[in-house]
């Protein structure tokens, strides 16, 4: 493919995104010829399209002893374009039974989402050869149509962000030819030839042998991946329609919906909903645990199926996803209206609570004292108010609580409570604005 042909293909990919002026286009730089080609094509595109924002990101997870030198080389090449760049070292936590490569990939994508705007388009250099290898890896894992679809040319990402792979139909040979013609600088990572790594084994041992025997084999793989993607899209559309008709509101998925269908349909419905909630899909075994346990679950059974980064629970005839949070913030006295709770979000309180020598404390501890709500008859324990509000048991201890002069006055999700502050003067919470709790998602729940 001629270099102008590659550029035309790149432009067609971006035009299909229906970009808006000011939207951010981000080149993800890994250092190889493919990502350097993406950057060069993007910079050519910038010359004719200055109405967008442009950014190049390289994250060094230090897996290779020469990675720091490589980063310096890549950064110098990127800055020669005069584009805004972000070059950072990246700490990669590796969990049990997780490969180093998978951990690095997850950490990179997570950090790039943090560094980009909500509607950004992240441009990736993955190509035809990568797509064929991905198909084989999914086949090895026993994947269905969704997995065998491999990588999409354009796909949703975090928030309103999207991933775009303009070179997905282009061979590695054509990319190298372009990079050489443009005299680009790139890194040859020697670990790419380590056939102990699954993808490298496929790249150097398996795919060349198959294409030597059947020259059109690669094209057939790409066609199968495309057909799987189309089949999956049709199935998802039908399942989403079925879910929509059954839901009373967006976060609710009644278990009665599962009882109306076969086991295969139950699994498909669960997969589609989890995907729509932006959770990673569970394994087949985990999905079966969810499906089977849900059929006999009760509020007292404390059902909990652990998945990757979340767990599935049962409450009030529905399944819920819990984000598997860490330690709660420590109780603290408040001297300012705005409080940063780290991974739990932010809390803004009315200034009136911080005047008149009031002692205002933030806590997550549930009191056994009975509380009254303005305009409501009777007094109840806080746990009973939370239960009445339909808040699942595992979330009841995760609600920020404001304690004024030793008395609970506000609970996130429940609102104001009333009490006597000084002698017989009633605390008039109805005249105070509601505190603003913006959750970062660490405490949040979603219903299946």
Swiss-Prot record:
One of its GO terms (molecular function) is ATP binding. Its EC number is 6.3.4.19. GO terms for cellular component: cytoplasm. It comes from the Bacteria. Keywords: ATP-binding, Cytoplasm, Ligase, Nucleotide-binding, tRNA processing. InterPro entries: Lysidine-tRNA-synth_C, Rossmann-like_a/b/a_fold, TilS/TtcA_N, tRNA_Ile_lys_synt, tRNA_Ile_lys_synt_N, tRNA_Ile_lys_synt_subst-bd. It is found in: Cytoplasm. SMART domains: TilS_C (SM00977). It holds the Pfam family TilS_C. ATP binds at residues 30-35. One of its GO terms (biological process) is tRNA modification. It catalyses: cytidine(34) in tRNA(Ile2) + L-lysine + ATP = lysidine(34) in tRNA(Ile2) + AMP + diphosphate + H(+). The keyword Zinc does not apply. HAMAP family: tRNA_Ile_lys_synt (MF_01161). Belongs to the tRNA(Ile)-lysidine synthase family. Ligates lysine onto the cytidine present at position 34 of the AUA codon-specific tRNA(Ile) that contains the anticodon CAU, in an ATP-dependent manner. Cytidine is converted to lysidine, thus changing the amino acid specificity of the tRNA from methionine to isoleucine. The N-terminal region contains the highly conserved SGGXDS motif, predicted to be a P-loop motif involved in ATP binding. PANTHER family: TRNA(ILE)-LYSIDINE SYNTHASE-RELATED (PTHR43033:SF1). This is tRNA(Ile)-lysidine synthase. It comes from Idiomarina loihiensis (strain ATCC BAA-735 / DSM 15497 / L2-TR). The gene is tilS.
């Amino acid at each position: 493919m001629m270099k102008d042909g590659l550029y035309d293909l790149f432009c067609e990919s971006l035009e299909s995104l229906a970009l808006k002026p000011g939207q951010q286009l981000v080149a993800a730089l890994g250092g190889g010829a493919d990502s350097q080609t993406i950057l060069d094509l993007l910079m050519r595109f910038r010359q004719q399209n200055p109405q967008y924002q442009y950014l190049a990101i390289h994250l060094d997870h230090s897996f290779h002893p020469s990675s720091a030198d490589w980063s310096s080389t890549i950064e110098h090449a990127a800055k020669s374009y005069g584009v805004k760049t972000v070059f950072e070292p990246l700490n990669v936590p590796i969990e049990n039974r997780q490969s180093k490569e998978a951990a690095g990939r997850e950490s990179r994508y997570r950090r790039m989402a943090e560094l980009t705007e909500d509607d950004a388009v992240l441009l990736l250099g993955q190509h035809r050869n990568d797509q064929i290898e991905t198909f084989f890896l999914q086949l090895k894992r026993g994947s269905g149509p969704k997995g065998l679809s491999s990588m999409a040319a354009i796909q949703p990402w975090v928030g309103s962000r999207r991933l775009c792979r303009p070179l997905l139909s282009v061979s590695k040979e054509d990319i190298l030819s372009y990079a050489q013609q443009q005299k680009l600088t790139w890194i040859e990572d020697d670990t790419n030839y380590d056939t102990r790594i699954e993808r490298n084994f496929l790249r150097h041992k398996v795919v060349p042998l198959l294409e030597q025997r059947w020259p059109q084999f690669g094209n057939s793989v790409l066609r199968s991946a495309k057909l799987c993607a189309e089949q999956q899209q049709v199935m998802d559309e039908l399942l989403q329609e079925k879910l929509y008709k059954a839901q009373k509101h967006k976060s609710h998925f009644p278990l009665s919906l599962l009882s109306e269908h076969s086991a295969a349909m139950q699994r498909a419905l669960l997969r589609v909903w989890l995907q729509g909630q932006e959770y990673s899909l569970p394994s087949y075994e985990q999905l079966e645990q969810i499906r089977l346990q849900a059929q006999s679950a009760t509020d007292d059974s404390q059902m909990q199926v652990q998945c990757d980064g979340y767990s599935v629970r049962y409450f009030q005839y529905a399944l819920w996803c819990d984000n598997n949070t860490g330690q709660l913030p420590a109780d603290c006295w408040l001297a300012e209206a705005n409080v940063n709770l780290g991974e739990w979000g932010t809390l803004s309180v009315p200034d009136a609570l911080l005047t008149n020598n009031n002692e205002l404390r933030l806590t997550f501890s549930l009191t056994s004292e009975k509380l009254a709500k303005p305009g409501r008859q009777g007094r109840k324990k806080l746990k009973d108010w939370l239960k009445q509000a339909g808040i699942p048991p595992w979330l009841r201890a995760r609600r920020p609580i404001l304690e004024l002069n030793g008395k609970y006055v506000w609970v996130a999700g429940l609102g104001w409570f009333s009490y006597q502050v000084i002698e017989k003067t009633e605390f008039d919470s109805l005249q105070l604005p509601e505190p603003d709790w913006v959750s970062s998602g660490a405490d949040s729940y979603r219903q299946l």
